[in-house]
UniProtKB/Swiss-Prot annotation:
Organism: Saccharum officinarum
Family: Belongs to the RNA polymerase alpha chain family.
Source taxonomy: Eukaryota, Viridiplantae, Streptophyta, Embryophyta, Tracheophyta
Stretch list, region Alpha C-terminal domain (alpha-CTD): 266-339
Catalytically driven reaction(s): RNA(n) + a ribonucleoside 5'-triphosphate = RNA(n+1) + diphosphate
Superkingdom, taxonomy of origin: Eukaryota
GO MF annotation, one: protein dimerization activity
Chain spans, region Alpha N-terminal domain (alpha-NTD): 1-233
Gene: rpoA
Protein name (database record): DNA-directed RNA polymerase subunit alpha
Amino acid sequence: MVREEITGSTQTLEWKCVESRVDSKRLYYGRFILSPLRKGQADTVGIALRRALLGEIEGTCITRAKFWNVPHEYSTIVGIEESIQEILLNLKEIVLRSNLYGVRDASICVKGPRYITAQDIILPPSVEIVDTTQPIANLREPVDFCIELQIKRDRGYHTELRKNSQDGSYPIDAVFMPVRNVNYSIFSCGNGNEKHEILFLEIWTNGSLTPKEALYEASRNLIDLFLPFIHTEEEGTSFEENKNRLTPPLLTFQKRFTNLKKNKKGIPLNCIFIDQLELPSRTYNCLKRANIHTLLDLLSKTEEDLMRINSFRMEDGKLIWDTLEKHLPIDLPKNKFSL
């Protein structure tokens, strides 16, 4: 049997957005194409991007609400139409946009009679509401209504077992998934030896980011996932050559800054925030995810601690070191973060 050899297209791989629309404040749609792809590649890329878009994109949600003088979540409050459980469900639906990391506090404090909407939430500066008209409760009488809220940025779907709260604090099941749905389809074209595939990708988001932004973030997450394999290849080493090799002890930032901390005690390291270092967004986000907010937080970490951070690379460590040398008015040691 003679097998016909089929080659892929030699054209440059390109992607573009062919349709973009805003159906509502909480529903954005985008349609993209990627081509030309060799046979089988479109399915590989489509599956990977769909999983990354649905499971790896971070979102911001209200995760906890604290009411005053409320015995349990099924209670009703005089003058308020909704029960506590209904209010919690309404808070769960609030769509937020932010670049915060860690837990932040928010609140609602109003006096009836009036309708309470998402616009009445008092938020930290780094958080904004996508749809301010989302309903929360209806105050039918002139009563005071105050809630303390917790806001968090994360990924995936988080549930917490509800218990009878003694202080009126109740968890809210959080859906940290700004991408609502993803579909992909494949179209084959070409004749003979020039057959190739076109990948069509449809993305729906909740308005906290656009489909294009979601596609970019998902792509970056996939790239970061495969970077360790690329670095191994660049090093040109094999398992056989390294299996008996002793790993040298990791250098620490503490050692490099020992003299700094001794001789520069007047520098308020806890007042220098990492966003002042003008780091690239990828490196900055890695540090923020690890709750590293100030220079003091950074210098308290060993190189081993930093390498445990998800998506943190050796290049990030060198970049941080070079940035400190460039921007901070201090005498730094000459030995740099080694690659």
